[in-house]
């Protein structure tokens, strides 16, 4: 996971590849700490991003778990939803048509995901985001881990719920997302 090509995993505290001995001796502790943090920087740990469609199976699992949907439910994708007064389009603006739950995942259908989110409602949706540890650190032994940014109950409304269901308008790290799938795949 080293994203710094000059990084030597066997000597992570060595700054001699970037600074002379004289420069190192003249550095304050804060300057050395800043230089090490820059060297140890890893975008998979420190940068957050919108997980997008990779989040959809987590929403479906949560909705099934709480009983908001069933495996035999069907959905109609007509290319988008009007949420309050906001039109939010599916990636397929012409619509996927009638879909089973399996089709929703296979087609990566934003329209159906919004319908699922509305059945979950805001408070339970946020609860499941937290149960899956979004908004928290993984505990990886690397510095500067980001938590990502989530809505809370006061700031999430129907439009934010709708866009969150297909992995937009909140953030996570590239280290956080695989953990949700690994624990289930390891059981197979």
For the regions a protein language model found, what residue spans apply to each?
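Beta-lactam-recognizing serine transpeptidase/beta-lactamase-like catalytic domain environment
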Residues: 1-53, 58-188
